């Protein structure tokens, strides 16, 4: 009898404990993991539901982009205006629409957006889903489920894992920037770096930072990359190893392949930020973009030990 009473009391105590409320996303959208390891989603423009488009998910893009070379985007929008575009390696004036377009991913349509047109290769993708759409939500990227979870602004932080590292987001050149520690050649630096899921790179330090700290020539590059943003001849990156990358107070990643930029035009030539984290780094984490509270949560996933470059493990 005593045993029964004790169990009943324990059960009653458990019932009285406050439970962490589960936040429900407003939508869950599957993504395709491309051969380039970047994220691709299905997007619809201006109510054309019979014309599904393959878009690159890009936290490094301020706007939504249509690929003007894709036959699938023809006639979807009228490009009657123009804007100045800062790409990774150039600054150009490109066509844009009025701010009256409708963009939908999953069930969530956002109206009043501007679209810009960039002539990517026809078979690259149909467009780029940038921040003008994404910042209407808190956004969680889950690689295990291969899904993107959209939350009402302010609800995202409730979905953050207790194991995630939280980084404070700022904005430079219109894109999110976070503080990261990096050790190069035995010297520690605290850098502000862009967060760019649209980049297939790992971790590039911008030209002004490289010059200011005299980094060129301090290591022999293991490879040279010649990048092409929206122009064909985009400049050079010297690929080297960073001793380590430090995220927050809890996570240190040793021997990360990074790069010293020598690009002289565009984002990587800008001193507005010290460098850029690309998707080849970010894919190792489930990511939660709390746009309401300007925070990025990074949770290690099962892609942590995915090779950065195949040629490095052959």
Where are these regions (language model features)?
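Short, composition-biased linear "edge" segments at structural boundaries
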Residues: 2-3, 17-19
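Pepsin/retropepsin-fold aspartyl endopeptidases
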Residues: 21-314
């Amino acid at each position: 009898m005593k045993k029964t009473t004790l169990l009943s009391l324990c059960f009653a105590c458990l019932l009285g404990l406050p439970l962490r409320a589960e936040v429900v996303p407003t939508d869950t959208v599957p993504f395709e993991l491309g051969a380039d390891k970047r994220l691709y989603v299905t997007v619809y423009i201006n109510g054309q539901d019979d014309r599904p488009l393959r878009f690159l998910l890009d936290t490094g893009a301020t706007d939504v982009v249509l690929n003007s070379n894709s036959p699938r985007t023809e006639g979807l929008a009228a490009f009657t205006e123009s804007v100045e575009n800062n790409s990774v390696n150039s600054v150009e004036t490109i066509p844009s629409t009025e701010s009256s377009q409708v963009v939908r991913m999953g069930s969530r349509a956002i109206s009043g957006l501007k679209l810009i047109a960039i002539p990517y290769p026809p078979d690259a993708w149909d467009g780029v889903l940038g921040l003008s759409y994404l910042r209407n939500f808190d956004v969680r990227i889950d690689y295990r489920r291969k899904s993107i979870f959209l939350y009402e602004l302010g609800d995202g932080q409730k979905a953050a894992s207790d194991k995630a590292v939280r980084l404070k987001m700022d904005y430079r050149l219109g894109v999110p920037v976070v503080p990261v520690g990096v050790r190069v050649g035995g010297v520690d630096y605290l850098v502000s770096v862009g967060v760019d899921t649209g980049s297939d790179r790992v971790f590039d330090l911008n030209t002004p930072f490289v010059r200011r700290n005299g980094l060129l020539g301090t290591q022999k590059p293991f490879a040279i990359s010649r990048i092409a943003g929206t122009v064909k001849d985009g400049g050079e990156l010297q690929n080297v190893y960073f001793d380590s990358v430090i995220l927050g107070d809890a996570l240190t990643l040793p021997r990360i392949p990074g790069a010293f930029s020598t690009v002289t035009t565009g984002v990587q030539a800008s001193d507005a930020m010290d460098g850029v984290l690309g998707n080849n780094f970010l894919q190792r984490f489930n990511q939660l973009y709390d746009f309401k509270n300007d925070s990025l949560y990074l949770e290690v996933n099962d892609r942590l030990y995915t090779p950065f470059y195949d040629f490095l493990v052959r």
